[in-house]
């Protein structure tokens, strides 16, 4: 138990460090880099841990929004939660994978969402209530070197025994003196990613300016035609494969394994189409 003097000294140190950080951040810009986890390189224990991390986060989130005392809820009480099984029956499960920092963050996230809805309601907007999630897609890692850290081309995540190999580290090579901060562990239904927030000195960022002036014509047969003759066809619709998969989905029974597998294939095809769109947009921006 800290004495009153020790508490005052600790708070003073926190204020001083906070002031130093704010002064430093004023000379920096924030960038987020996204890295894809090399799932094929993960061992059995790592795959199980990452999978259950999102499953338990979903259980906790759904359990919390069903509670009446969310504002005074203690994260230390989240050792067990009640959730639904696939037959909609209530079952109690132990929380084995989600750490205390993530539990705290989930409580904070829900409280902020409720406050946001309350503000909208006071302004006259029609609002509902928070809905239960069938899938959880983002887990915040809030303290670098504790919940997560970057080591070469691999990440260390709290709770996972071995390092996790990721793809895309070369994005960082053109920057110097990077301050790594919070991160988000992401899941799009198929692949896992780590989105790492960084602060970079403004002086270390090279600004490239092009003095060329280019005219743009938006046509029908070709989406974009530049005055230098460059043409871009950025119209990407549904693929034939996606149409076939969506047609098959109608005949699948809800809740069946075959329907679940088919939904994963449809989601994967959507991701593939979105990747094509992002690739074209990046080529246009950097051309």
Language model features with spans:
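Nucleic-acid substrate recognition interfaces
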Residues: 1-287
């Amino acid at each position: 138990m800290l004495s009153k003097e020790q508490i005052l000294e600790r708070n003073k140190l926190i204020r001083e460090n906070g002031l130093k950080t704010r002064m430093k951040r004023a000379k920096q810009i924030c960038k987020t880099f996204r890295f894809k986890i090399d799932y094929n390189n993960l061992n059995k224990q790592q795959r199980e841990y990452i999978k259950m991390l999102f499953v338990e986060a979903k259980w906790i989130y759904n359990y919390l929004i069903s509670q009446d005392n969310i504002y005074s809820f203690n994260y230390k009480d989240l050792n067990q939660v009640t959730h639904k099984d696939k037959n909609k029956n209530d079952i109690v499960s132990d929380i084995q994978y989600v750490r205390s920092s993530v539990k705290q963050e989930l409580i904070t996230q829900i409280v902020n969402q409720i406050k946001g809805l309350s503000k909208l309601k006071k302004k006259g907007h029609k609002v509902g209530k928070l809905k239960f999630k069938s899938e959880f897609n983002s887990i915040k890692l809030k303290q670098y070197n504790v919940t997560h850290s970057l080591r070469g081309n691999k990440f260390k995540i709290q709770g996972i025994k071995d390092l996790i190999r990721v793809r895309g580290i070369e994005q960082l090579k053109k920057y110097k003196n990077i301050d790594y901060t919070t991160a988000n562990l992401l899941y799009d239904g198929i692949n896992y990613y780590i989105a790492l927030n960084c602060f970079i000195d403004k002086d270390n960022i090279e600004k490239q300016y092009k003095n060329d002036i280019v005219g743009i014509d938006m046509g029908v047969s070709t989406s974009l035609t530049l005055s230098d003759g460059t043409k871009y066809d950025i119209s990407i619709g549904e693929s034939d494969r996606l149409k076939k998969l969506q047609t098959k989905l109608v005949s699948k029974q809800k809740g069946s394994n075959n329907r679940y597998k088919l939904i994963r294939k449809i989601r994967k095809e959507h991701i593939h189409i979105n990747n094509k769109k992002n690739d074209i947009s990046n080529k246009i921006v950097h051309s």
